[in-house]
């Protein structure tokens, strides 16, 4: 039987694996179908992780994490997990190929995925001017003009954040009304650096080998078209947590989740199910930063070690 099964191979999962193996967990297994690393491997530039002296790609940044974990004995099961369920005092992990595994404890570190828009050019320039993280990438556009797409709290809050860094921020929304908190909207409207473009849609993201250069936008009320010359385009149209592994045969969830599907945990990353932990972007109130996900993974692993000692 597996002592600790870690579902997901991003920064949270790998950190959990490192701390678990170095902490004496003899049989820790990482379940990740492809090479571990997580969605951060798709980033073209990492600059805000402590100790990283030069800008590196997400792929290069995560490679040593994998090597370090495997060096300390973390095992890698290259399969996707379909479902995690509990049977008596242990967990049953069902893989997509029908194979099952049993584990004494489980850390869910499956993360989440920003919703895509399908705008022409989005995939081509993803990570090359198209971003879903102002905290991660805003600094690259210091004193430059950028555009933000979205009408919820996150979009408006990130527009305000970017206004502290950038020369100008265009906030694009397909409707005249916003779904964010009124006080947040008021702060954005009172910021001279933020220009509201409503009701507008983005028809195309344009650029060249160096990245994004402009956006083609259209007013849905008048059909007026404009070209915004911006090197950075931030998309905030929603976020999907990858919690499908929690869904049971009767459609219930293995553990408590909030209204967005994020796993409810305490400060030690414990869920309401004994022996089940969660870390990284899958949990409630996740900051969605690599350094925070790594911290979560370490915390979850330490909690697992304590759990295994007493059970």
Curated annotation (Swiss-Prot):
Keywords: Cytoplasm, Disulfide bond, FAD, Flavoprotein, NADP, Oxidoreductase, Redox-active center. GO terms for biological process: cell redox homeostasis; removal of superoxide radicals. GO terms for cellular component: cytoplasm. It is found in: Cytoplasm. FAD binds at residues 31-39, 281-290. Binds 1 FAD per subunit. Disulfide bonds join 133-136. Its cofactor is FAD. It is an enzyme of class 1 (oxidoreductase). InterPro entries: FAD/NAD-bd_sf, FAD/NAD-binding_dom, Ferredoxin-NADP_redctase_2, Pyr_nucl-diS_OxRdtase_2_AS, Thioredox_Rdtase. Its main location: cytoplasm. Homodimer. Belongs to the class-II pyridine nucleotide-disulfide oxidoreductase family. The active site is a redox-active disulfide bond. This is Thioredoxin reductase.
């Amino acid at each position: 039987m597996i002592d600790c099964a870690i579902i997901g191979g991003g920064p949270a999962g790998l950190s959990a694996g490192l701390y678990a193996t170095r902490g004496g967990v003899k049989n820790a297994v990482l379940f990740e179908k492809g090479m571990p690393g997580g969605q951060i491997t798709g980033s073209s530039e990492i600059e805000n992780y402590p100790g990283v002296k030069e800008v590196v790609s997400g792929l290069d940044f995560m490679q040593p994490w994998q090597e370090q974990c495997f060096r300390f004995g973390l095992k890698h099961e290259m399969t996707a997990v379909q479902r995690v369920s509990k049977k008596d005092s242990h967990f049953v992990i069902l893989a997509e190929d029908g194979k099952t595994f049993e584990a004494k404890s489980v850390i869910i570190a499956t993360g989440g995925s920003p919703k895509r828009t399908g705008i022409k050019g989005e995939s081509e320039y993803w990570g090359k001017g198209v971003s879903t993280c102002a905290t991660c990438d805003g600094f690259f556009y210091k004193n430059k003009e950028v555009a933000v797409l979205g009408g919820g709290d996150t979009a408006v809050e990130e527009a305000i954040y970017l206004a502290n860094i950038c020369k100008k921020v265009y906030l694009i929304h397909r409707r005249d009304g916003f779904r964010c908190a009124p006080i947040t909207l008021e702060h954005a409207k009172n910021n001279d650096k933020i220009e509201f473009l409503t009701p507008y849609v983005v028809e195309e993201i344009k650029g060249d080998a160096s990245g994004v250069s402009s956006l083609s936008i259209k007013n849905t009320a008048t059909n007026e078209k404009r070209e915004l010359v911006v090197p950075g385009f931030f998309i905030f149209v929603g976020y999907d947590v990858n919690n499908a592994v929690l869904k049971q045969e009767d459609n219930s969830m293995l553990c408590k989740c909030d209204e967005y599907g994020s796993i409810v945990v305490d400060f030690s990353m414990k869920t309401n199910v004994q022996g089940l932990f969660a870390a990284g972007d899958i949990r409630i109130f996740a900051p969605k930063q690599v350094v925070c996900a790594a911290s979560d993974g370490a915390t979850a692993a330490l909690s697992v070690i304590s759990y295994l000692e007493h059970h």
